[in-house]
Amino acid sequence: MEGWQRAFVLHSRPWSETSLMLDVFTEESGRVRLVAKGARSKRSNLKGALQPFTPLLLRYSGRGEVKTLRSAEAVSLALPLSGITLYSGLYINELLSRVLEYETRFSELFFDYLNCIQALAGTTGSPEPALRRFELALLGHLGYGVNFTHCAGSGERVDDTMTYRYREEKGFFASVVIDNNTFTGRHLKALEEREFPDVDTLRAAKRFTRMALKPYLGGKPLKSRELFRQFMPKRTVKMKKD
């Protein structure tokens, strides 16, 4: 890919004494693995640019699975994430690294990612709504189509007051039993509209996306979730002291 394209670094690690191995998400080519030669050297002007959450323009070349970065420019400063929003950003980066195949184009998902990072950078409250919207968008781009508006059993529109059980690849069915796999009609409408006005609908959305993403993630836990769990007790203690 010789032309310039927009991209974000999802993850980087040292590769030899002076180079970096990058996992990047690009607008035109999707997820790509790149070697940034010399990026770790003291004289390199790339080191500061090749950071997560920094909007980039880059060019690369190569025919194998690992391409060679030819040039990269930061379009702007890194989007300002810190504390809980930083961990949230690391979570969506890891999510993309785990579920996307290399060199599969997801142009619309690229902008969903950008919108999510911008929402996280601009939030003064909980990052949860932005995360749930991104997870739902990701599932849609992966082909995980779910009808939130109609009961799969009867074909009727869901009722706010009724309970529905989710069956993978089949949809939601009316249920008289309430457990972790059931959702109210109100929850389903919130999922369809991507609007979560209260804690109850946010929790329901999180339950659903965890359930739906599990087949893509397998049994290996996400490292970012563990980091987030370690961060939350510290944050709670600090809030109590304040």
Curated annotation (Swiss-Prot):
Coiled coil: none annotated. It comes from the Bacteria. The keyword DNA damage applies. One of its GO terms (biological process) is double-strand break repair. GO terms for cellular component: bacterial nucleoid. Gene3D superfamilies: Nucleic acid-binding proteins (2.40.50.140), Recombination protein O, C-terminal domain (1.20.1440.120). Keywords: DNA damage, DNA recombination, DNA repair. The keyword Amino-acid biosynthesis does not apply. Monomer. Involved in DNA repair and RecF pathway recombination. Belongs to the RecO family. HAMAP family: RecO. NCBIfam families: reco (TIGR00613). This is DNA repair protein RecO. It comes from Salmonella enteritidis PT4 (strain P125109).
